[in-house]
Amino acid sequence: FVGANVGAQMYIGDHISEGKAGKLITPTFEINVGKWFTPVIGLRAGFGGYQAKGYSVKDAGFAYKRVDTNLYRTKWGILHLHGDVMLNFTNLFCGYREDRLYNAIPYVSIGYLRGIDNNENELSGGVGFINRFRLNKAWDLNLELKGNINNDVMDGIRGGKNMEGSAAIMVGATYRFNRRDWTK
């Protein structure tokens, strides 16, 4: 299968509580390819990107705007390449049915983050949940929730926390190639 998603994400980094969290929400996109090996287990590789925003208490990292005496807004670009192990809970607990309207698919993820505006390279780990709605034999509509964690320095600021991360909600579509069902 191949798919594409768009949505909104928020980077959760140092000093997030110092400013308005709503100012940190930015657009995100993702394209992916994958294969279901059984009706329950599948693998997916994805590539996406977004402009992350955050806050800093000093003019450091990717500060671009002073919002208070000791508070700056920051922004930087991130590319994310990841692999996911997916488990179709609906097929696992309710049995396989090709024409099922809805499937619940949680996954675990490992990935690589590359800073566009810096030379930061970080590994990431994550979890997600795909709400898959069947449109027809070939197409699905997806509502996906995901979260990732990574090392403290991805935002260019070492703030004393061990981890930072991001959370996203996306909507997208998946096209399933021929051989769309499983024989029993």
Q: Which sequence ranges carry the predicted segments?
A:
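Residues that define the transmembrane beta-barrel architecture of outer-membrane proteins
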Residues: A21-F29, G77-L81, Y102, N119-G125, ...
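Short glycine/proline- and aromatic-enriched beta-strand/turn motifs that initiate or cap beta-hairpins
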Residues: F1-G34
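Outer-membrane beta-barrel proteins
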Residues: S17-A21, V33, T69-R73, Y96, ...
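Sequence/structural signature of outer-membrane beta-barrel proteins
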Residues: Q9-I16, A52-G54, L92-C94, G111-D117, ...
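Predominantly the C-terminal beta-signal and adjacent terminal strand-loop region
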Residues: L43-R44, G48, A52-A63, L71, ...
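Gram-negative (and chloroplast) outer-membrane scaffold detector with strong preference
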Residues: P39-L123, L135
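Residues on the lipid-exposed face of transmembrane beta-strands in outer-membrane beta-barrel proteins
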Residues: A4-A8, I31-K35, G83-F89, V108-Y112, ...
